[in-house]
Amino acid sequence: MKIEGKVAVVTGAASGIGRATAKELANRGARHIALVDLSDEVHKVAQELNDADSGGIAGVFQGDTTDPEFRHQVFETIRAEHGVVQILVPAAGVTRDSLSVRLDKETGKASIYALDKFRFVIEVNLIAPIYWALEMVAQISEDRFARGLKRWKADEGLQGSIIFIGSVSS
């Protein structure tokens, strides 16, 4: 995958796999990297990347990756300032450690994993990454239409790359 000169978005960029991915994209010559995270730590990551680049390679979008309005605004802002997103790494993830079934050793009663926790984990780790990908594909489609292009043809090359991430904790 060609990274040099591309515009990228990395969610979960404040720590872990997201942070490491953002640094690697910078090392490989991405033109702009939008760092997305709920944590304030994302500003430190941007500062590190910008200090190393001296050209202001990284931008920060602090917010909730499950919020559709936030997601759309991130893509619209990037398109207006840097062009269409060409690389997406939706690496934001959460865990809510708990056994799926827990047996109380004194009472013998079993309790199951709380539904609200399960829904939250699925929303962040599965649904949100898919919708970030759909947002990118929609933006590429709009850009193609604006340029008078119709159906994609293989000789046009890649329009974008989406890299889904998983880990033991997510």
Identify the role of each PLM range.
Residues 30-44:
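Conserved glycine-rich Rossmann-like NAD(P)H-binding loop of the short-chain dehydrogenase/reductase
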Residues 2-34:
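Canonical Rossmann dinucleotide-binding motif of NAD(H)/NADP(H)-dependent dehydrogenases/reductases
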Residues 167:
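Residue(s) in the substrate-gating loop at a strand-loop-helix junction
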Residues 94, 107-133, 163:
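Catalytic Tyr-X3-Lys loop
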Residues 43, 62-73, 115:
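The beta1-alpha1 cofactor-binding region of Rossmann-like NAD(H)/NADP(H)-dependent oxidoreductases
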Residues 11, 85-101, 125, 164:
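Rossmann-fold scaffold of SDR-type NAD(P)-dependent oxidoreductases
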Residues 52-57, 76-90, 96, 111-114, ...:
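A glycine-rich helix->loop->beta "capping" turn
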Residues 123-156:
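Amphipathic alpha-helical dimer-interface segment in Rossmann-like NAD(P)H-dependent oxidoreductases
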